């Protein structure tokens, strides 16, 4: 579910550790709470499976974002670099169900012309998506991490996603898409640059 939320950090992050045993115990208790028998056939291995799945789904909590953007190239490039349609899967922190969609990430390199690898941008999206999230914060975290590491003249991030907490419960509106954006630097101060980037992002 999209909504306001705060986190301990944006572009900075203290790496945590996953507690497999504690996660398994929590899932077992949840099964008891909904009236199920966690020892019956079909559920006996569920706590371990769910814990392993959560470890993968929340892997972004256990990775330092600075380690992702660790490859730079001196290309003396001074125009927009844009990676579109990056698939993302994240988890709404309000209901712990999925939201999924795509991210479009663009930046104009700084005066030194340094760029990062295109795959690094996709990895950065994946890292921040693999946390308990709200879409607005996810969008800003991606933008702020690029600003911190690349010192670019401008950054623009647009995320489009469908939230299962709106589709399968509550208002039950499957197919509704939420769009969020974060702009930094030149894209925030220069309307023409922002419009050009958005045109490229929205062009199919």
UniProtKB/Swiss-Prot annotation:
Zn(2+) binds at residues 92, 95, 165. The keyword Protein transport does not apply. PROSITE patterns: GTP_CYCLOHYDROL_1_1 (PS00859), GTP_CYCLOHYDROL_1_2 (PS00860). GO terms for cellular component: cytoplasm. InterPro entries: GTP-CH-I_C/QueF (IPR043133), GTP-CH-I_N (IPR043134), GTP_CycHdrlase_I (IPR001474), GTP_CycHdrlase_I_CS (IPR018234), GTP_CycHdrlase_I_dom (IPR020602). It comes from the Bacteria. One of its GO terms (biological process) is one-carbon metabolic process. Keywords: Hydrolase, Metal-binding, One-carbon metabolism, Zinc. Pathway: Cofactor biosynthesis; 7,8-dihydroneopterin triphosphate biosynthesis; 7,8-dihydroneopterin triphosphate from GTP: step 1/1. It holds the Pfam family GTP_cyclohydroI. One of its GO terms (molecular function) is GTP binding. It catalyses: GTP + H2O = 7,8-dihydroneopterin 3'-triphosphate + formate + H(+). The keyword Lipid biosynthesis does not apply. Its EC number is 3.5.4.16. Homomer. Belongs to the GTP cyclohydrolase I family. This is GTP cyclohydrolase 1. The lineage of its organism: Bacteria, Bacillati, Actinomycetota, Actinomycetes, Mycobacteriales.
